[in-house]
């Protein structure tokens, strides 16, 4: 893996640092101070913006909105004290399994 492949880890590390220091001029810290509902609202907004960009079909807009959604998803993980490695573990677990088989294996 190249250093570029670790960008999610790097961004997550910055988010964790901003959470810990609660710097006044930090967007991340500011959003976290507003609470879970504000964090969830932002994730929802970014997901919607990605869907709209996808419908528009302009690759640069899709990439931009996907990056926003990734960032805010990482922020939510941090807010809830969920290590990024847990997402990696889940993705590795699913890798190579058909989506239908994976869904059927879940407990309800």
From Swiss-Prot:
SUPFAM superfamilies: all-alpha NTP pyrophosphatases. InterPro entries: HisE, PRib-ATP_PPHydrolase-like. It is found in: Cytoplasm. Its main location: cytoplasm. Pathway: Amino-acid biosynthesis; L-histidine biosynthesis; L-histidine from 5-phospho-alpha-D-ribose 1-diphosphate: step 2/9. One of its GO terms (biological process) is L-histidine biosynthetic process. Pfam families: PRA-PH (PF01503). Keywords: Amino-acid biosynthesis, ATP-binding, Cytoplasm, Histidine biosynthesis, Hydrolase, Nucleotide-binding. It comes from the Bacteria. It catalyses: 1-(5-phospho-beta-D-ribosyl)-ATP + H2O = 1-(5-phospho-beta-D-ribosyl)-5'-AMP + diphosphate + H(+). NCBIfam families: histidine_hisI, PRK00400.1-3. This is Phosphoribosyl-ATP pyrophosphatase. It comes from Pelobacter propionicus (strain DSM 2379 / NBRC 103807 / OttBd1).
